[in-house]
Amino acid sequence: MKIFKLLLISILSFLLFACGEEKPEEAEKVEQIFYTVMPRQEYKLNPQSYSENERALLTQIFEGLTELKTDGVRLISVLNIEHSDDYKEWTFTLRDDLKWSDGEKITADTYLDSWLDTLENSRSDEIYRMFVVKGAKDFYNKKINKNSVGLKVQDNKLIVSLNTPIKNFDEWVSNPIFYPIRKENINLSLDKKIVNGAFKV
């Protein structure tokens, strides 16, 4: 009887060991397709200038620093967010693995250049959101140069100085007007747009 028990234990141990050694098969990559119904109109999908109808689609193909959900702010392109005690200076530390769909790296400089370009060229109704940044409105109105705007980069950190305290500035930057941009997208068809979000058109 003892021999039978030992034999049974040995067999079970072997089976457990064998199962543990099995390498799971690589999950087959499945193309994910997102369908949405949009009103008939011309779509440019430009974060610098977009209609309310385009906003829902923009948030699927582009990503900003954060995303506003029902349960609060979700960090998207940043590792962490810090602010001064008076909420007038905010520091966004970006992830190191951010890339555009064509493989080009996205850095803190990408955001700085994009925000300045948006202030310089956008005529969107949403541009007022950027005016909370120190000097942004004056730069938009061509009164000062870009070096006087409250934006700077240190390593992979985007440091933003505000005119007044904004306790929810991490929510503020979830708006598409704060998304990074690629200038060449202006001349590209919708299916050729260079994006950084989960989907492409």
Positions of PLM-derived features:
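Short, well-ordered beta-strand elements
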Residues: V30-Y43, E89-F92, Y111-S114, L158-V160, ...
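C-terminal motif of bacterial Sec signal peptides marking the signal peptidase cleavage site
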Residues: F17-A18
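Aromatic- and charge-enriched surface segment that lines or borders ligand/interaction sites
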Residues: I81-I127
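N-terminal lobe/hinge region of extracytoplasmic solute-binding protein
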Residues: V37-D86, I194
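Sec-dependent signal peptide recognition
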Residues: K2-I9
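Solvent-exposed, polar/charged alpha-helical surfaces in well-ordered, non-transmembrane soluble domains
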Residues: T59, E63, D109-D117, E171
